[in-house]
């Protein structure tokens, strides 16, 4: 996929529907490891009782960390447009008997959440969504002052290892949808100062922005 092209939502969901049952087995091919997910959830700085939204929750790979962070008094709202991916997430919720996880099949760009949010997570989804800025805007409107948006994703932009990592990124985009040249920090800067940390030789990053007490 090119640096500016995004696949339409229907095409993206079709791809994920096809691989949903095998997604966990495919994660090593994408160099996705539990420490990356834990790092993203930790960056949300959630407290027990918090309400958190995950945009592009997929099969629910982040749910154990999110549920642990908010505790039994908190709530996790997990959104994805793929029926197949959410079906796998529902199996996980059933096995773990989580009563505080709500799964929603929605287009994130049109999402309307009816609760105030203490955190919003885009984990490996911001570079895939056809309209990520719209999804961010809708989520931001429901965030409490002091709440955080965290974007964890893969990308080649602004990394000194860009030339070395380019073949890996091209392979990843062949295996699944996504724009390795996505710049989520440009969208996030509309809302405040952005903190960015890179890891795994700069291939992955975590971006954080905090909603000010004024609510701006």
Please provide the spans of the model-predicted regions.
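Class I SAM-dependent methyltransferase SAM/SAH-binding core
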Residues: 53-55, 59-110
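C-terminal alpha-helical "lid/dimerization" subdomain adjacent to the S-adenosyl-L-methionine
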Residues: 10, 29-30, 150-205
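Short glycine-centered segments of the SAM/dcSAM-binding site in methyltransferase folds
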Residues: 51, 75, 146-148
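Helix-to-beta-strand junctions that scaffold the AdoMet/dcAdoMet cofactor pocket
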Residues: 71, 129-130, 143-144
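A short glycine-rich, Lys/Arg-flanked "PGG" loop and its adjoining helix->strand segment in the class I
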Residues: 133-145
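Conserved class I S-adenosyl-L-methionine
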Residues: 2-45, 61-65, 88, 164-171, ...
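A short acidic, Gly/Pro-enriched loop at the edge of an enzyme's catalytic core
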Residues: 109-120
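A short SAM/SAH-binding and catalytic strip from SAM-dependent methyltransferases
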Residues: 119-132
């Amino acid at each position: 996929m090119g640096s500016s092209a995004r696949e339409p939502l229907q095409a993206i969901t079709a791809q994920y529907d096809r691989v949903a049952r095998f997604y966990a087995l495919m994660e090593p091919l994408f160099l996705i490891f539990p420490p990356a997910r834990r790092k993203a959830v930790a960056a949300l700085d959630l407290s027990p009782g918090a309400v958190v939204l995950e945009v592009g929750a997929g099969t629910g790979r982040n749910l154990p960390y999110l549920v642990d962070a908010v505790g039994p008094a908190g709530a996790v709202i997990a959104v994805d447009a793929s029926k197949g991916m959410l079906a796998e997430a529902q199996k996980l919720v059933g096995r773990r008997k989580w009563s505080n996880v709500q799964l929603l099949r929605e287009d994130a760009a049109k999402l309307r959440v009816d609760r105030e949010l203490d955190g919003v997570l885009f984990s490996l989804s911001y570079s895939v969504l056809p309209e990520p800025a719209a999804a961010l805007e809708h989520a931001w409107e429901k965030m409490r002052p002091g709440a955080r948006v965290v974007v964890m994703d893969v990308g080649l932009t602004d990394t000194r290892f860009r030339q070395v990592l380019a073949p890996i990124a091209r392979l990843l985009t062949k295996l699944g949808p996504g724009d390795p040249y996505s710049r989520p920090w440009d969208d996030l800067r509309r809302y405040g100062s952005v903190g960015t940390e890179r890891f795994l030789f700069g291939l992955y990053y975590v971006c954080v922005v905090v909603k000010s007490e004024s609510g701006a």
